Amino acid sequence: MDNLIKDMRENLNSYSFKVVSDLVKELEVNRDNKAQIKELADLLKEDKRKNVSSLGNRLEKNLNNLIKEEERVKNMYLFDKSFGDYKYVAGVDEVGRGPLAGPIVSAAVILDSSDLDDIILYINDSKKLSEHKREELSEIIKEKALSYSISMCDSKEIDEKGIGYCNNEVFIKACEGLSIKPDLVLSDGYLIKNFNGENKHVIKGDTKSACIACASIIAKVYRDNIMKEYNKKYPQYDFEKNVGYGTKTHVDALKEVGPTEIHRMSFLKNIL
């Protein structure tokens, strides 16, 4: 990067717009090269050619977006630390409460919040992320988390015990499955009933808390992959796209073919 800046300082005027543009396209703005990106952006902005100057403005915008993202995520980590002097704070969230088919899945995650220069950028409510971004982040989270655990209840359990019971149960099991016992558990939405530990609930926690957001992401990716596998066995329900939710294609298939073993019969009373 330093060599590129040196080269640009010496030869920018002799480079065509296309050459400069191609060089800029190859650059990835990240936490390790912010100072160099700023220097390069300033250099390009000073160029008398408007199209080259605009590349500098674009590079500066990308840098500012990164800085804003760092600040947003840092605040999520600080939120987790704001509850007191707890060493290990876990976040727990679920996915799959509303679908007509498939399990309800919960994940619990403990992050290392001691180094705010080593945070996981772009974490958020899993529903706000693209499928590709969720999958990418899920791997990063599992690699960097101090501990994580995933739990689920299948459709049979949901029919037998009710979705509310199963929602609470997967929260408990995910927390109990952690290799590190959390000093505090932050749960998305509501308190965990009959939980043997300290617990605080956070409304819309997956947008406020780093550990809840991470739990949301790995739970979503895990469940989506389960439903994609079911799609191979039951292709007519389009599980790969709807992951069990009641889309028109899914409901039409239910009416034409009937339910499968993974459908929640207690959810189908108003459909069949």
From Swiss-Prot:
Span of domain RNase H type-2: 87-272
Name of the protein in its database record: Ribonuclease HII
Species of origin: Clostridium perfringens (strain 13 / Type A)
Signal peptide: none
GO biological process, one term: DNA replication, removal of RNA primer
Compartments, record wording: Cytoplasm
Enzyme Commission number(s): 3.1.26.4
Principal localisation: cytoplasm
Cofactor annotation remark: Manganese or magnesium. Binds 1 divalent metal ion per monomer in the absence of substrate. May bind a second metal ion after substrate binding.
Catalytic reaction list: Endonucleolytic cleavage to 5'-phosphomonoester
Keyword Metal-binding: yes
Alphabetic keyword roster: Cytoplasm, Endonuclease, Hydrolase, Manganese, Metal-binding, Nuclease
Cofactors: Mn(2+); Mg(2+)
CDD domains documented for this protein: RNase_HII_bacteria_HII_like (cd07182)
Leading EC class: hydrolase
Pfam families reported for this sequence: RNase_HII
